[in-house]
């Protein structure tokens, strides 16, 4: 089998395509959450805390010298990233919890059908029936 044909079969499998779609949707969702945190949640929170812009929170490790920029530790941006993570984690947790609930409800609605008897079980039942028939004669 040629390398390209093998790769094409791998790439077109259902689970690989599903994974690619999930990654793309996840990236878009991440941008939406980042905007929600940066543009909607953090400004009112900063206002409640006295007009603070979290993006401006930083420690200067080394001041700027001429054309050399300052070295800073942006902990305000880190705080925003923590809010992003918490919101994404909460959304994913909620989605998984909902999916699990729907699966449980579906499983409860559909009673499990008993498995079909194996050939061994069918043969044993036939032997039992033959033995019963011989004893009743």
Curated annotation (Swiss-Prot):
GO cellular-component term (any): plasma membrane
GO molecular function: mechanosensitive monoatomic ion channel activity
GO biological process: monoatomic ion transport
Source organism superkingdom: Bacteria
Residue stretches spanning the membrane: 10-30, 76-96
Membrane topology: Multi-pass membrane protein
Primary localization class, coarse: membrane
Entries under Gene3D superfamilies matching the protein: Large-conductance mechanosensitive channel, MscL, domain 1 (1.10.1200.120)
Pfam families registered for this protein in UniProt: MscL
Locations listed in the record: Cell inner membrane
Keywords on record: Cell inner membrane, Cell membrane, Ion channel, Ion transport, Membrane, Transmembrane, Transmembrane helix, Transport
Family label: Belongs to the MscL family.
Function: Channel that opens in response to stretch forces in the membrane lipid bilayer. May participate in the regulation of osmotic pressure changes within the cell.
UniProt subunit comment: Homopentamer.
Protein name in UniProt: Large-conductance mechanosensitive channel
Organism: Yersinia pestis
Gene: mscL
């Amino acid at each position: 089998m040629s390398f390209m044909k093998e790769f094409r079969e791998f790439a077109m499998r259902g689970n690989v395509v599903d994974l690619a779609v999930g990654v793309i949707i996840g990236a878009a969702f991440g941008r939406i959450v980042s905007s929600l945190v940066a543009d909607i949640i953090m400004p009112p929170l900063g206002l409640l805390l006295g007009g603070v812009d979290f993006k401006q929170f930083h420690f200067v490790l080394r001041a700027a010298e001429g054309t050399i920029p300052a070295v800073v530790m942006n902990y305000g941006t880190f705080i925003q990233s923590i809010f992003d993570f918490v919101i994404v984690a909460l959304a994913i947790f909620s989605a998984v919890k909902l999916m699990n609930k729907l699966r449980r409800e579906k499983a409860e609605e559909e009673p499990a059908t008993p498995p079909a008897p194996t050939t061994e079980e069918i043969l044993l039942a036939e032997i039992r029936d033959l033995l019963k028939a011989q004893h009743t004669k």
